[in-house]
Design a protein with these regions (language model features):
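Active-site-proximal beta-alpha loop/turn segments in soluble metabolic enzymes
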Residues: 1-2, 36-44
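Glycan-recognition surfaces
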Residues: 1-10, 14, 49-50, 54-153
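An active-site-proximal structural segment forming one wall of the substrate-binding cleft
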Residues: 3-31
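Surface-exposed alpha-helical segments enriched in charged/polar residues
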Residues: 17, 21, 54-57, 61, ...
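Short, intrinsically disordered, charge-balanced linker/junction segments flanking boundaries
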Residues: 22, 35, 190-193
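Short, solvent-exposed turn/loop segments enriched in Gly/Ser/Thr/Pro and often Arg
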Residues: 30-37, 72-77
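Glycan-recognition and catalytic regions of carbohydrate-active enzymes
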Residues: 149-193
């Protein structure tokens, strides 16, 4: 959709608002890929982004109790302006904990930790096949918004108990992780651990 056009923005605002007003929705992941090449005119990227902000401003004002999460994958949407409408952004579709170390390290150079969506996902990872312990996956996820994206019905009783302990621990450290000072002690680009 050409979000540089007012009539397109109004259409999106109305269509999305209609859905949100008529359903019990508390969370929306706005996974929006955009064309980054072959722009039709000079200034199109800027106009498109302003249209996107217009849409998000209208929708988030109408629905202040819905958590909107942005998504950077494929669309370059992890920008400072988006944080005015979406307090957290999915950093990458690559959810492998080890790969996320570098991504989250780099992202935290420009964005607050509490805006970096980071979840414990299934192992072995569906993108790279790496098998990573539940503890390691949680340790990485603590350094972001922290959540789970896996099928707990496929977990052992022991793993389920570990998840409950991880959630309890995260609740204890949440304020520190979101509002504390961040010191980068090791650069993952300069070491293998």
């Amino acid at each position: 959709l050409d979000l540089s056009r007012d009539e397109v923005c109004e259409y999106v605002i109305n269509a999305v608002s209609n859905i949100l007003a008529n359903a019990n929705i508390e969370y929306v992941k706005w996974d929006m890929n955009r064309q980054l090449t072959d722009m039709p005119r000079l200034g199109y990227n800027h106009e498109y982004t302003l249209g996107y902000y217009k849409i998000m401003s209208a929708i988030t004002e109408k629905f202040p109790n819905i958590l909107f999460e942005g998504c950077s994958s494929g669309g370059g949407r992890f920008d400072a302006g988006v944080l005015a409408y979406m307090p957290q952004i999915w950093t990458s579709d690559n959810s492998d904990a080890i790969a996320r170390l570098k991504m989250q390290y780099s992202t935290s150079m420009c964005y607050p930790v509490y805006s970096i969506s980071s979840h414990v996902t299934a192992s072995p990872n569906h993108q790279c096949g790496r098998d990573t312990s539940l503890r390691t996956r949680a340790d990485v996820a603590y350094c972001g918004t922290f959540g789970y994206e896996l099928d707990v019905t496929k977990m052992s009783d022991e793993e389920f108990e570990e998840i409950k302990a991880q959630i309890k621990f995260e609740k204890r450290i949440q304020d520190l992780m979101c509002n504390g000072d961040l010191y980068r002690l090791i650069n993952p680009y300069e070491t293998n651990y």
